[in-house]
Amino acid sequence: GKLFSEVTDTIKILQSRGIEIYIASGDRKGAINKLAEILNVNKKHAFGTVSPKGKCKVVRCLKDRGYKVMMVGDGLNDVLAFNNADVSVLTVEQEEEVSPKLINKTDYVIQKISEVISIDF
């Protein structure tokens, strides 16, 4: 995947608010570990080569531990996780055509990743 330009600052702001960041991606584990390092995200919270069902499992496990979960994603492969999160956010920053079906499955649609900062959940 592509790293959005504002993601580093966005992650820092969220972390400063005490929000724990988890990454679940279909990308290679090595790439996700590197991303976690760049973003200063705990590597134990970074999961690579994750299927759509796997993303859903991550969301469910976090909720089972008492976390309130905001799922941010950008594609149809995120729908299962969106459906299980407390708040689902679709980012359309990737500039690909987005399915109306996908838009209808989310609580929020954002143009820039930094917009998650203003979502109260």
Predicted regions and their residues:
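Short, acidic loop-to-helix structural element flanking the phosphoryl-transfer center
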Residues: 1-20
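Short, charged, surface-exposed secondary-structure boundary motifs
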Residues: 53-59, 98-106, 119-121
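Short acidic-hydrophobic, aromatic-tinged amphipathic segments that line or gate anion-handling sites
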Residues: 44-50, 107-115
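Hydrophobic/aromatic ligand-binding patch that stacks against planar heteroaromatic rings
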Residues: 13, 35, 61, 80-81, ...
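Acidic, Mg2+-coordinating phosphoryl-transfer loop and its flanking beta/alpha structural elements
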Residues: 25-29, 68-108
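Cytosolic catalytic headpiece of P-type ATPases
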Residues: 3-6, 29-33, 97-98
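Substrate-recognition "cap/lid" segment bordering the active-site pocket of phosphatases
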Residues: 29-68
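Short beta-strand/loop segments at the ligand-binding rim of alpha/beta enzyme cores
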Residues: 16-20, 62-69, 86-87
